[in-house]
Amino acid sequence: QILLTQSPAIMSASPGQKVTMTCSASSSVSYMHWYQQKSGTSPKRWIYDTSKLASGVPARFSGSGSATSYSLTITSMQAEDAATYYCQQWSSNPLTFGAGTKLXLKR
């Protein structure tokens, strides 16, 4: 199975700061998908097919990458972006998730 390693595990950003988190796959995958989860809620699909934003996701979010290296970027951190972000692949069975990047707001 394909192992997804997310970095950093925990990070914080000030309002307006650019944020980048990465997801590294142990083998090449065709696409990467990202989910956002806030405490006490179910994960929401956030970015799919590497770079497509799910409905309602602000344009300050973007996704990029290929093969074994992928990233999620927020151009300008906002308070509501504080959450845990998970990458996921389903190019190869079984479907696998990364362990998550927890993003906190620095005030």
From Swiss-Prot:
Cited InterPro entries: Ig-like_dom (IPR007110), Ig-like_dom_sf (IPR036179), Ig-like_fold (IPR013783), Ig_sub (IPR003599), Ig_V-set (IPR013106), IgV_Light_Chain (IPR050150)
For region Complementarity-determining-2, the annotated ranges are 49-55
Region of interest called Framework-4, as start-end residue ranges on this chain: 97-106
What Gene Ontology terms describe where this protein resides (cellular component)? immunoglobulin complex
What single Pfam family name could you report for this chain, choosing any that match? V-set
Segment Complementarity-determining-1: which positions?
Answer: 24-33
Which biological process, per GO, is one annotated for this protein? adaptive immune response
The UniProt entry, under SMART domains, shows: IG, IGv
Task: Please give the residue ranges the record annotates as the region Framework-3.
Answer: 56-87
Taxonomic superkingdom:
Eukaryota
Q: Where is this region: Complementarity-determining-3?
A: 88-96
From the Swiss-Prot or TrEMBL record, give the protein name.
Answer: Ig kappa chain V-VI region NQ2-48.2.2
Organism of provenance? Mus musculus (Mouse)
